[in-house]
Every structure is written in C-alpha cells, then in structure tokens.
Amino acid sequence: MRRRTMLGLAAAVGTAAATPSLLTAAPAGATHRPWCEEYTSLGGGLHPVHVLRVGAPAARQVLVLVAGQFGAAGSLRMLARELAGRLPGTQVWAVDRRETNLADLSGLRGNDPDRAADRYLAGRYRSVSAASAPYVAGWGLATALTDLRRVVRAARAGGRRVVLGGHSWGATTALAYAAWDFAGRPGYRDLTGLVLIDGGVHDAFAGEGDVYRVTPEQARAGLADIAAGTVFDPSLTMGRTETYAILQLLAGRYAVAAPDAPSTLAGRLPAPLRPPGPVSNAGLLRSEYVDAPLVPDLSVNPAYTSIATVARTLAAARPGAFEWYWPQRLTLDLSAADPFARTATTDLLGLRLCHPTAIDVPLYSFQTGLTHGTANAAARWVVAHSRISSASYDGDDAMTHLDALWADRNPMLRTLVPFLRRLEP
C-alpha cells in the first residue's frame, strides 16, 4: 500500500506472544517432511521482533520476507506456504515488525465474531496513541533495519544462506538493507539474493502516481510534525489509527465462520467501507476487495484470489494481515530513501544508504498491473547502477497488488521458484 494513495482515503473518512512450534503435514504440492509452521519471537527486549517460519526446518536456505506499508506477517503466509511447499531446500520467514506488539488482541479469545465485534466497535480494548507510546516517534528505517538484521543473523545461523525480499514498501526495505552500512559492513554481504515483489526504489511506484522527492525542508517539517504528536501514519485512520485493521480482521472472521449468513457488520462500517445494500459475510469481503475497493492497492482479482482465501488471510490474528499502527517516521524515511542514493535529505535523517552501487547479489523482480511497468523498470535501474550481474524479471498486468501474495494459483511462482532454487546450496 502506498502513502499518497492512503492519504486520499484518510481525507475521505476524516504485545504479541510467540505461539508454539507446529510440526504438521506439508501442504499440497510439498515434496518433503517434516513441515514446520511456527510464529516465534527473536527477542529485542521490550519491543521484540517476531517471525512466521514456514517450511522444512533442515532447509539450508532461508527467504526472509518483509510486508509493505500496514502489512504484517500474516499477509505473507499464503505465499510462504506455496514457496516452501515447492522448495525442499528453502524455508520462508515472514517478518512482523516491532509495532505489531502494540495491537491489543485480547478481544479475540474464542471464536465468536459477534462478541469480538461488540467489544472492539465499542472501544473496549487498549488503544495506543502518541501520548501512551511517544517512543514510536523514533521508529524509523534505522530501527526497522536494525530489527531486520536480527532476523537475518538468526536466519544465517549454522551457515544457512539468506535471500531477502519484500512486497511493496517491503521491497524498498529489502533494498535499503542491502545498501545500508551496519558499522562498516554493507548489508548486502549478509545476503545471497534479493526478491522484489511489486515494489522497490527509484520511482518503482511512479506508474501508480507515487513519486517521492523529499527535500531537506520537507524532511524537517515531517520531523516537526512527528515531534508535535503525529507519531502514527494517519493514512488509514477511520476514527482511530487502528480501526481499519480491526474491521478487516472482524470481516474475515465473520466470513470464515458463516460465509453465507447475512452480514451484521456491514451496517456498522464507516461510509467508505459500507456496501450499498444487504450482503452476506462473504459478500462484504467481495464488496471491499472486488466490487468497490477503497484503492487499487486493496483489491483482488477473483480470477486469481478467491474470497475464501481473503477471508482466511484476514481472519488470522497472530500473525495478522495488517498492522494496527504504522510509525510515521518509517513513512518519512522510506519516502526519503526512494532515490536510492546518499542525498542531503538522507544525511539529515541519518539514513546510512552508503552502498547501493556495490550490491552484487542476484535480483528477482515481479510486477503486477498496479504500477504499469515501473516496478520492473526501477529494478532494471538498480541493476544498471550496481554490480548485480544476474537478474530476473516477470510480471502479470491482470494481477493486483494483493494477488501477488494471496493468489490461489500464483503465476509468480513459475519464475520465482526457479530463481530461488538456483540459489540453494
């Protein structure tokens, strides 16, 4: 999801614990046993980072995936399962950033969506604000990459190889990691490959209408706004910062529990989400994601992604599909990092993007119809302005931004799986 698009939406509407390790049967298409799917903490003191690990525990390669703006590890579960099921030598780790710990999931105990809806829609949960969490003002790209390096180092344990990838601004984050200077060590030296899914740097989102040129003056103004209390990105705000994520979680749970039952949630939604007439629980998701999506970023093409898959993805809470709170400082820093070079603005913000031209690991880029060709064009620019000697590009213009992650039959696998297989030890 993109910042500028989400701002238009905002104008229109005015701590997680680790789960036990699960050794289960592999999904259809998998060629190996045992199959591990676990959500666990990698530490980090008061603000731990969590990962969803999917695939063979003995795999010698790990693909670390980062979600985009407002995206969480649960949004990557479907893709992680599909990849790990086809690649016996690769385990997939989907990252949950530290801000996911801020969500109050206590109202989701049990499987009663009516009870959960009554609690959350009445505001009977712990809502986080700038006053209660002022420390989030400092959670920018440096913090995100420090946390991500903890994940990468854990993935590298025992001599495993690590490929780093991401979706949307998660792809931007992956490239920033590769170019980052970690106390004299370039980030790309931790990696054996990069995977960019419908995102990146250097005008990757220009085809959608998003071009980022943050001047030093704009950066100073952004920092001042954060210091004045705009700690959380307001792009998805519907009354409260977290309301949109909560509503999607509830809609998913209703659709999983009783897809054909009349939706009691629909009439309680804010106007931009409310369908024009009565719908079923599954019909509410179709209205939101197919018939009348808020923005192109938040849509699916039913030729690729079924409403049942949308429901299952949204219904999960730990990990969930959406972050409840996105740090405004991270929005500012990722926007400023888009030129993928050291600038006066990156210096002002303390962004250590010192090694973009030295990156030398294989790169994969996939684009959907969202960016009208600019995602792959931007990836080609990165390759042309670095030491990358091997790159693969693919795309499907009929797919949406979310289809790349949630598709039941994902065309991206035809080229991403061979790319990752070539990198396996």
Language model segments and positions:
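N-terminal export signals
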Residues: T5-A25
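N-terminal cap/lid segment of alpha/beta-hydrolase-fold proteins
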Residues: T31-H50, V54
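Short, surface-exposed "cap/lid" segments of acyl-processing enzymes
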Residues: A56-G110
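Alpha/beta-hydrolase active-site loop
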Residues: P113-A155
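Gly/Ala-rich beta-loop-alpha elbow adjacent to hydrolase catalytic centers
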Residues: G166-G170, A174
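Alpha/beta-hydrolase
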Residues: F205-V361, G369-L370
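Conserved loop-alpha-helix segment in the C-terminal half of the alpha/beta-hydrolase fold
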Residues: S365-Y393
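Catalytic active-site module of serine/aspartate enzymes centered on a nucleophile-bearing elbow/loop
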Residues: I388-P425
